[in-house]
Amino acid sequence: MAERESGLSGGAASPPAASPFLGLHIASPPNFRLTHDISLEEFEDEDLSEITDECGISLQCKDTLSLRPPRAGLLSAGSSGSAGSRLQAEMLQMDLIDAASDTPGAEDDEEDDDELAAQRPGVGPSKAESGQEPASRSQGQGQGPGTGSGDTYRPKRPTTLNLFPQVPRSQDTLNNNSLGKKHSWQDRVSRSSSPLKTGEQTPPHEHICLSDELPPQGSPVPTQDRGTSTDSPCRRTAATQMAPPSGPPATAPGGRGHSHRDRIHYQADVRLEATEEIYLTPVQRPPDPAEPTSTFLPPTESRMSVSSDPDPAAYSVTAGRPHPSISEEDEGFDCLSSPEQAEPPGGGWRGSLGEPPPPPRASLSSDTSALSYDSVKYTLVVDEHAQLELVSLRPCFGDYSDESDSATVYDNCASASSPYESAIGEEYEEAPQPRPPTCLSEDSTPDEPDVHFSKKFLNVFMSGRSRSSSAESFGLFSCVINGEEHEQTHRAIFRFVPRHEDELELEVDDPLLVELQAEDYWYEAYNMRTGARGVFPAYYAIEVTKEPEHMAALAKNSDWIDQFRVKFLGSVQVPYHKGNDVLCAAMQKIATTRRLTVHFNPPSSCVLEISVRGVKIGVKADEAQEAKGNKCSHFFQLKNISFCGYHPKNNKYFGFITKHPADHRFACHVFVSEDSTKALAESVGRAFQQFYKQFVEYTCPTEDIYLE
């Protein structure tokens, strides 16, 4: 403090050029003296009126703070040496007692105070009075502010102009300082340096001047009138937005700008009488490094009493920095998110030299910018997430096509299938339920010899996404081997990579014909998809569900079979097991998708065999493939067919709905023919009649009735 005093007294002759006080003129009544050092640790009263009207506080004031020597060129010739310190005390006390003006009857008290202030003599006090000021203030702990002499104490209701009218509120709201942060001003004293000693210029402010009058530009010392104007309700907004971070001030040399602002940027809207004038010239400083933003600081950290700063010289530094008085701290959070209020409603920016308004600092809108950034970031995250979904779906479509998990039997026979085709079943597919895939081998496409074989040769609507034993195929796969037709017996549930020559490669859902089950839990089987034989671990496959033996025996006794040549368009999972609307919707879905790929991926020709057992889709193969014995087919048991029919407007389209043997899922298979499919639908109906007749004869034999 001695260094600070010496620095100030040394600058009395000529103020430093870098000082923020380029011009300060004070015309103050002589006996205008305030007690002001109300620190935060004593600020515990719940009623603000007790602080201003009674003696429930300790008035602490350091000698070095109240006896600061005046500076030549800053104080007028008619002012004494202690006028600067008294003015700073007045400025502080006015902010502290501002809440008292919110109570009923405050306006009447203000008028009386204005009259008292106008009647005071204009003679400045002596230095002896200034020297006795700390002692008199320390004695005022047990007295009210209005009980002392006029030279030492303020009247009971000190002067306030109430330039910022507020809605009357309860005292609890006005003075909610019971949770105030302790030792905040002591930390700031020990960790920060004086702005006068460092010679740091004042940063550009949001409000350069609060006056409605502009000084003449030709005056030697450009000044501003901070007397009686400005009704800026946004003073609380900007002050709250400029709240310092909750942590202690920075101690590094590079952080002195932060500590400087922490000390001074709360001390702006000082309320003086109409007779008092302060002329300050704003000095622009280069933008300081980015300061940490504090988004929605708690009230105990963002608010700051004017008395928490022990350096009174800093109180007259800022001409335009907003400062929340105690009565305004709580409501400062109500307008955090309104950056539009950062400008005074009366008329924008008023600079001392008429210069255009400076660009607003980032720290002034740190909270609002953080809010807007959060919303923008949220929007970007949503967009990015949607983009990632699109990217992740494309390889999934490719995997469906490669892994034979698409919606059509023929689509997976060619690797060039469009991703649109693989998405056929998405509209009717429930999320947790796997879509039944359909696949026929390349043997069914004699017109495309160059297309490589599909990775998976699955049964119609076999679920490639379900790995449980209950997710079996919608139909059974059969294959002609050595002139004899065999149906699949097992289905692969895991992928098996062979490590020896005699092992069989398996993909998930491969149709298998197990020929031998060894005791060491290895199976010797034939892979109907690849046409290869080998061994694999028994736990890599499960047995498929077959029709009962008695039903198979009844079907073999029937010689009735109808055959129809059609082209298979595809299959799609549907939400319901019957209905013309369901059938037509599935046909429309598949036909629309197939139209996009009909040129490079034409539908496969097949033969529909209708019998009492069910419906078999036999793939038409060429002679070379038939010689190899690779003729394959898909079989659907008649008991699992729930609905069939042709399109009412175009009878060339035929479809039937099948139920999954184990799961509660349904799929619709669509075909197209060159001729009408009415005969096909009638054949399926006749098969149902025969099947029902045989079923009834088996379950309810007539001879049993006669025997009874």
From Swiss-Prot:
Residues 468-657 are annotated as: Interaction with VRK2. Coiled coil: none annotated. Residues 11-24, 71-87 have a biased composition (Low complexity). Residues 126-282 are annotated as: JNK-binding domain (JBD). Keywords: Cytoplasm, Endoplasmic reticulum, Membrane, Mitochondrion, Nucleus, Phosphoprotein, Repeat, SH3 domain, Ubl conjugation. It is found in: Cytoplasm; Cytoplasm, Perinuclear region; Nucleus; Endoplasmic reticulum membrane. Residues 264-274 have a biased composition (Basic and acidic residues). GO terms for molecular function: identical protein binding; JUN kinase binding; kinesin binding; MAP-kinase scaffold activity; mitogen-activated protein kinase kinase binding; mitogen-activated protein kinase kinase kinase binding; protein kinase binding. Pfam families: PID, SH3_9. Highly expressed in brain and pancreatic beta-cells. Weaker expression found in kidney. The modification Phosphothreonine is found at residues 103, 202, 408, 445. GO terms for biological process: JNK cascade; negative regulation of apoptotic process; negative regulation of intrinsic apoptotic signaling pathway; negative regulation of JNK cascade; negative regulation of JUN kinase activity; positive regulation of JNK cascade; regulation of CD8-positive, alpha-beta T cell proliferation; regulation of DNA-templated transcription. Phosphorylated by MAPK8, MAPK9 and MAPK10. Phosphorylation on Thr-103 is also necessary for the dissociation and activation of MAP3K12. Phosphorylated by VRK2. Hyperphosphorylated during mitosis following activation of stress-activated and MAP kinases. Ubiquitinated. Two preliminary events are required to prime for ubiquitination; phosphorylation and an increased in intracellular calcium concentration. Then, the calcium influx initiates ubiquitination and degradation by the ubiquitin-proteasome pathway. One of its GO terms (cellular component) is membrane. A motif (D-box 1) lies at residues 350-357. Residues 105-116 have a biased composition (Acidic residues). This is C-Jun-amino-terminal kinase-interacting protein 1. It comes from Rattus norvegicus (Rat). The lineage of its organism: Eukaryota, Metazoa, Chordata, Craniata, Vertebrata.
